Each structure stands twice: as C-alpha cells, then as structure tokens.
Amino acid sequence: MIAATADSFEIEKAKLCRKIAELQAALNAKDQKLRELQLAADNLLAEGEVQLAPRDHYTELSNDDIARYSRQLILTDFGVSGQMKLKNSAVLIVGLGGLGCPAAQYLASAGCGNLGLVDYDEVEPSNLHRQTLHTVSRCGISKAESARIALLELNPHCRIICYSNLLNSFNAMQIIPAYDVILDCSDNVATRYLLNDACSILQKPLVSGSALKMDGQLTVYCYGENGPCYRCIYPVPPPPEAVTNCGDGGVLGAVTGTIGALQAMEAIKVIVGLGEVLAGRMLIFDGSSCQFRNIKIRGKRPNCHVCSSQPLITGLIDYELFCGMNANDKDNALQLLEPEQRINVLDYHKLATEKKSHLLLDVRPPAEFEICQLPDAVNVPLAQILDDSYVQRFAQQLESKEYPIFVVCRRGNDSQIAVQHMKTRFPDHSIRDLEDGMHAWTKLVDQNFPIY
Ligand SMILES: Nc1ncnc2c1ncn2[C@@H]1O[C@H](COP(=O)(O)OP(=O)(O)OP(=O)(O)O)[C@@H](O)[C@H]1O
Ligand SMILES: [Zn+2]
C-alpha cells in the first residue's frame, strides 16, 4: 500500500517536473519573442518609417477635388468644410483583410488625405473572396503594399503609408499618435485589447468591426467624454477555446464588406462631425435575415482598468500573455496526446494501401467533409464524438480489437480532442489520430489533395 502511494507520488512528481520544464520553455520562447519584437520596433524606427511625416495642411479644394468629390460636396451636411476636414485627416487601418479592404477603399475614394495601413501578412488565394483590394497577381506580396497599389489607382491624391509589420506593444505607441481615427479591422483578441488600450491612453476614437459566418458587429470605442472602451464592455478576455476565427468558422465576403463599409462611414462621421457617431451603442448585423439591430451598450465603467479616472493600466502590456492567445488568428498546434497515440500520415497511408482493416473517422463538420475526404473516411463531427452519440453507430468496430480506429481532421487539433475523449471510454482500444491532419496529407502523401 505504502509502496503504491510512493509510486503514485513519483509519477505525480515526474508529471510536475515535465510541466515545469514546459513552462520554462514557454517562458524562454516569450523572452526570445520579446527581444525580437523590440529589435523589430527599433529597426522600424531606424528606417524612419514609423512616423507619418508632418502633414500638409490644405485650406482649399482643387478643381480636381471639386470634380472628383462633387456628389458628396453637394450633400448639405457634408459640403466643402466636410471635404476639407477629410482632406486634412489621417486614418490608421489595422488589418487589410475582409474589413480593412472595403474600409480603406471607401476612405481613400471619399478623399481622406492620409491613410496608414498596418498588416504583417501576405496576400493568399483564400483571401480573395472577400479582401477586395487584393488580386491574383499580388498573391504573395504584403497586404499593406497590395492595398496601397489598389488605393492609389482609385485615388492618387491620397497619401498612403504602409507598415508591413505586426502592430505590437512597442510600435503601437509610435505609430498611433500621428493619426486622428483608428480602425480595428483585425481578427484576434490580443490585437483588440492592444488597440483599445493604446487608443484609450492616447485618446483616439477606435472604430471597431468584426464579422464571422453571416454576422457582423460594429461600434466606436473611446469616443468623447463618456464613450466606453472595449475593456469597459469586456473587462477580461474570453477563454481561447471560445474564440472562433474565419479560417475555422467561415465568413461570407459580403458580410465583411458591409461592416467594413460602415467602419469607413463612422470614421468619416467622426472626422467631419456628422450625424450621430455609433458610440455607447453596438450595431448587430444578422446577414441571414438581413436585420440590423442597434443595442445600447454600457457607458464608461467607473473602475475600468484603462479608461477610468484612476486607471491601473497606463502603458501597454503583453497582450498575447494577457489573452492567452497569439496576435493572429492562426490556430496553435495542440499537444494533447502522447506520441504513441498518434500516427503520421505516411505510416497511415502505407497501412491503408495494404488494406489493413481499420476505421477512419473524420471529425470535421459536414460542410468541410463535403469539400474533400480521405479514401474510406466516415464523417463523425467532433460534437458527436464528445456527446458519445457515435458509440452506437460503431458498436461492432469498438468491440473488436481487429478494428484499430484512426481519427483525422483538417490540421490535427480536433482529432486529438476526439482521441482523448474516446480513450476515456475505450482505454484498451487502439485509437490514434493522424498527426497534422489533412494538411500533412497534402504535404507528404498527395500534393493534388485540396488544401483549405
Ligand atoms: N496585430 C496585428 N498587426 C498587423 N496586422 C494584423 C494584426 N492582427 C491582425 N492583423 C491582420 O488583420 C487582418 C484580418 O483580416 P482577415 O481575418 O479578413 O484576414 P486573414 O487573417 O487573412 O483571414 P484568414 O483567417 O481567412 O486567413 C489580417 O490580414 C491580419 O494579418
Ligand atoms: Zn474602459
């Protein structure tokens, strides 16, 4: 009995030691990243690229301006003074993706004099269905540069500064002060908090948009005396597992187009002093029923950590650490299973080619299964694994040791969750997942297999 207890202590101790080693490694990686970010920010500053050069101040419209903007100049509430304000304004757009492209397009064409474009990413074919400034021929180049090319064709009078870098806690405070209005067109929680805190500290209106699947949201933070900030509404970040991105959940391009265009609209209203800015309210767009709802959101939180009269946060922090998520929407590779609970795609391919009896469960949603599947795969969405409703369907295979079970998904994360769950019910059955999922299949087994 005592020996057994000592053994279990030893096992527990070994586990804790492993955990400590993992945490130490994570800490070292963060330290390294911090050094890289600092270096990148220094380089950027050294290149003199960060500062928007002193803006020209215009006092009148040119003939070309009058001809170009005539249809908005004749608007009673807009007029010459509105156009002059736009011409002298500077707007920073963070993210030149689904939201940022239409927002930039409407701001440049309306005559916003100075646009800053921030995006660290490059154009990919899967962006083109909604990121309307980019083109097939510009795949592979910086999104900020690609957007600049398109925008200058639209309006050569617009001055455009590109920052083809990740906006982070070092460069944000150098870039943002030069701009009048900031547009959050990013796709991740860490960047939302970073932009919020920077805008709150620097007192810049932040036009925040988001879109997923068929739905979108829009509001303006940090606007005026009483306008709440993002932290007033969301004091703590959501748990990482509750966050879905466009790459996983999907999105319709016209939804991002709708919200992006409205972000441009709110920015123009802020600059020109037009209408009623969407602060303290949130627009909820349900694309499937085409309904726009405007809900009142709470005002400034008296104890908000960043925008209250006695803030706890007076400088930018490490937002990836704070949110437990990276400042991008790419999935982190999970490490849930032991190596013996996984099989690489080459070994699986060999076994399947030799026609060894087995069952291959594909745990992606049906819409994704319809796009492409591995030979003989059976679609059992992850939800059916987790609620155990698959058990009855595969009772025969689960009873027979002759049927090793393999689980596959798109990138090898959900498949691990599925195996971990199935193992709790069938600990003695051989159940393994395909490492790195179908992406690895395309890379290592069949380059003609579609990737998405
Ligand atoms: N901190 C940041 N600094 C600079 N750019 C950012 C930052 N966070 C997000 N972005 C950019 O914001 C954009 C968000 O747009 P969107 O989600 O439509 O594009 P995406 O990430 O290319 O899409 P997908 O998920 O389909 O690959 C991306 O281009 C992304 O690179
Ligand atoms: Zn606040």
Curated annotation (Swiss-Prot):
Binds 1 zinc ion per subunit. One of its GO terms (molecular function) is metal ion binding. The modification Phosphothreonine is found at residue 59. Residues 354-450 form the Rhodanese domain. Keywords: ATP-binding, Cytoplasm, Metal-binding, Molybdenum cofactor biosynthesis, Multifunctional enzyme, Nucleotide-binding, Nucleotidyltransferase, Phosphoprotein, Transferase, tRNA processing, Zinc. GO terms for cellular component: cytosol. ATP binds at residues 98, 119, 126-130, 143, 187-188. The active site is at residues 246, 409. It is found in: Cytoplasm, Cytosol. Its main location: cytoplasm. Its cofactor is Zn(2+). It holds the Pfam family ThiF. Its EC number is 2.7.7.80, 2.8.1.11. It catalyses: [molybdopterin-synthase sulfur-carrier protein]-C-terminal Gly-Gly + ATP + H(+) = [molybdopterin-synthase sulfur-carrier protein]-C-terminal Gly-Gly-AMP + diphosphate; [molybdopterin-synthase sulfur-carrier protein]-C-terminal Gly-Gly-AMP + S-sulfanyl-L-cysteinyl-[cysteine desulfurase] + AH2 = [molybdopterin-synthase sulfur-carrier protein]-C-terminal-Gly-aminoethanethioate + L-cysteinyl-[cysteine desulfurase] + A + AMP + 2 H(+). Pathway: tRNA modification; 5-methoxycarbonylmethyl-2-thiouridine-tRNA biosynthesis; Cofactor biosynthesis; molybdopterin biosynthesis. One of its GO terms (biological process) is tRNA wobble position uridine thiolation. InterPro entries: MOCS3/Uba4, Rhodanese-like_dom, Rhodanese-like_dom_sf, ThiF/MoeB/HesA, ThiF_NAD_FAD-bd, Ubiquitin-activating_enz. Zn(2+) binds at residues 229, 232, 304, 307. NCBIfam families: PRK05690.1. PANTHER family: ADENYLYLTRANSFERASE AND SULFURTRANSFERASE MOCS3, UBIQUITIN-ACTIVATING ENZYME E1. In the N-terminal section; belongs to the HesA/MoeB/ThiF family. UBA4 subfamily. Plays a central role in 2-thiolation of mcm(5)S(2)U at tRNA wobble positions of cytosolic tRNA(Lys), tRNA(Glu) and tRNA(Gln). Also essential during biosynthesis of the molybdenum cofactor. Acts by mediating the C-terminal thiocarboxylation of sulfur carriers URM1 and MOCS2A. Its N-terminus first activates URM1 and MOCS2A as acyl-adenylates (-COAMP), then the persulfide sulfur on the catalytic cysteine is transferred to URM1 and MOCS2A to form thiocarboxylation (-COSH) of their C-terminus. This is Adenylyltransferase and sulfurtransferase MOCS3. The gene is Uba4.
